[in-house]
């Protein structure tokens, strides 16, 4: 079994690599890069002249990993190492120096001129294979005591130690690390939290500009929520998430931060607490409710269809389930939405918001109706197949009733293959339901994927595809392992378990 799991994990990693790499390559080579400025609110404000526009575009392209870029000042500083007489002025002498410097650089660097001022800049197009390499090279972000290198704070202490922190109690506290708290405990699930290892999926742009992708989908939503927060210097009413403290150069700290954290503590950068759940949690809420509804409908219905096969119950149920399976998802979504709105349920999430349970009802019902038909038909199939098995004949010979045989013997064995899909279904709810969330304007990960595609938020699209792929692939492995726990007769081996 160990060898089987090892090989499955290895194949899973290869699959994740192939899917993510293909997605990354398609997005960063086939999608016109200037589309990213369509929903950038700062673009028209900053790019008031041709020079400012070109500089802003190149700066963003560099941040997004398309190019390397030296603006006029940077180029002059770089070229001065070769010829100290070079200036930023637009003249033939400087141009000749810059051209010579660019030729020395090689590797695809080109010299450009701003339209209005005529001043010079340099760019290098980063090849797609190099971009992909950088994505994977920076994917795993490990925090350590030499993470922060701040020239303005050369005497920064460097350590890792357990201490009774005045703000959060016992925790593993770091200095010289990016995060203040590397390991801590609180009442929020999963109760034990760490900041040693984090995923770096890039920064979001243009929506949620310059915010890490993982932070966008895991932080709360809505307005900030204030509460009594225990700071190192005492309790204050604030929206600060005290557990999120990261390093900030002391020269950049304002008086409020110094008053809250103390003069000698440089870990003053924090995230905020919000009123409503994050995208992951929001998708999980409706997904789990929908999953429970799906199994609550499918299990008794499928069992009844198998027990009373070839009767009117079986025929009627089969017809209804076939209709639901044939009905386009978009049609089912709008039918349920119409019915729900007629009984005073909100047909759009923002109407009542995350604070009202009614906002979750229709999306959860739709997910339940989408999942129930297929599950019910599989239960019927498995149970009918088992009705002709020897152990069923033996049970009948012992005089057991059909109800006892169905409930105690057939049903139990029929659940084994279905159990393998439960971990995938449970974990899969994190990914959300793209169509349902979009129609209801539901703030989950499914809707975020569609919104990111529309906004050409390439980093977010790649990040979500990576997360969805990991969830999909590893949940299948968990399903196989769970099946062996339910039925010890099943063995996972390389020979028979591929």
From Swiss-Prot:
It is found in: Cell membrane. The chain crosses the membrane at residues 12-32, 279-299, 316-336, 359-379, 415-435, 461-481. Residues 280-479 form the ABC transmembrane type-1 domain. It holds the Pfam family BPD_transp_1. Coiled coil: none annotated. CDD domains: TM_PBP2. Its main location: membrane. PROSITE patterns: ABC_TM1. Gene3D superfamilies: MetI-like (1.10.3720.10). Keywords: Cell membrane, Membrane, Peptide transport, Protein transport, Transmembrane, Transmembrane helix, Transport. It is a multi-pass membrane protein. One of its GO terms (cellular component) is plasma membrane. InterPro entries: MetI-like (IPR000515), MetI-like_sf (IPR035906). GO terms for biological process: peptide transport; protein transport; transmembrane transport. Part of the binding-protein-dependent transport system for oligopeptides; probably responsible for the translocation of the substrate across the membrane. Belongs to the binding-protein-dependent transport system permease family. OppBC subfamily. This is Oligopeptide transport system permease protein AmiC. It comes from Streptococcus pneumoniae serotype 4 (strain ATCC BAA-334 / TIGR4). The lineage of its organism: Bacteria, Bacillati, Bacillota, Bacilli, Lactobacillales.
């Amino acid at each position: 079994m160990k060898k089987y799991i090892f090989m499955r994990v290895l194949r899973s990693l290869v699959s994740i690599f192939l899917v993510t790499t293909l997605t990354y390559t398609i997005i960063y080579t086939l999608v016109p890069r200037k589309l990213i400025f369509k929903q950038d609110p700062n673009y028209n404000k900053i790019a008031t002249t041709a020079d400012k526009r070109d500089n802003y575009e190149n700066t963003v392209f560099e941040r997004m990993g398309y190019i390397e870029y030296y603006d006029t000042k940077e180029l002059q500083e770089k070229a001065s190492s070769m010829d100290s007489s070079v200036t930023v002025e637009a003249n033939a002498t400087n141009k000749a120096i810059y051209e010579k410097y660019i030729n020395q650089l090689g590797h695809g660097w080109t010299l450009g001129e701003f339209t209005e001022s005529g001043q010079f800049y340099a760019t290098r197009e980063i090849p797609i294979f190099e971009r992909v390499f950088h994505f994977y090279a920076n994917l795993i972000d490990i925090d350590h005591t030499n993470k922060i290198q701040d020239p303005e704070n050369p005497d920064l202490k460097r350590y890792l130690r357990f201490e009774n922190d005045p703000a959060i109690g016992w925790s593993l506290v770091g200095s010289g690390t990016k995060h203040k708290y590397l390991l801590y405990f609180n009442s929020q699930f999963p109760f034990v939290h760490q900041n040693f290892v984090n995923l770096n999926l890039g920064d979001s742009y243009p929506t949620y500009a310059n915010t890490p992708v993982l932070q966008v989908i895991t932080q709360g939503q809505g307005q900030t929520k204030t509460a009594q927060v225990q700071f190192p210097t005492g309790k204050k009413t604030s929206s600060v998430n005290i557990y999120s403290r990261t390093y900030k150069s002391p020269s950049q700290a304002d008086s409020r931060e110094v008053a809250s954290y103390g003069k000698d503590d440089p870990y003053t950068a924090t995230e905020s607490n919000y009123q409503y759940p994050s995208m992951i949690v929001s998708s999980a809420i409706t997904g789990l409710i929908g999953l429970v509804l799906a199994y609550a409908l499918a299990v008794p219905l499928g069992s009844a269809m198998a027990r009373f096969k070839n009767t009117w119950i079986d025929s009627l149920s089969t017809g209804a389930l076939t209709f639901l399976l044939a009905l386009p998802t978009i049609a089912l979504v709008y039918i349920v939405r119409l019915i729900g709105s007629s009984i005073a349920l909100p047909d759009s999430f923002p109407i009542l918001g995350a604070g009202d349970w009614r906002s979750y009802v229709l999306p959860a019902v739709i997910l339940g109706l989408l999942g129930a038909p297929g599950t019910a038909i599989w239960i019927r199939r498995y149970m009918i197949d088992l009705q002709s098995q020897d152990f069923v004949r033996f049970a009948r010979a012992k005089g057991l009733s059909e109800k006892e045989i169905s409930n105690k013997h057939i049903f139990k064995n029929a659940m084994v293959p279905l159990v393998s899909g439960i971990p995938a279904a449970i974990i899969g709810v994190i990914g959300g339901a793209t169509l349902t969330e979009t129609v209801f304007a539901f703030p989950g990960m499914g809707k975020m994927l569609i919104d990111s595609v529309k906004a050409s938020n390439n980093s977010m699209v790649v990040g979500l595809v990576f997360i969805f792929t990991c969830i999909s692939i590893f949940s299948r492995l968990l399903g196989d392992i769970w099946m062996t726990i339910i039925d010890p007769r099943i063995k996972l081996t390389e020979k028979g378990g591929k």
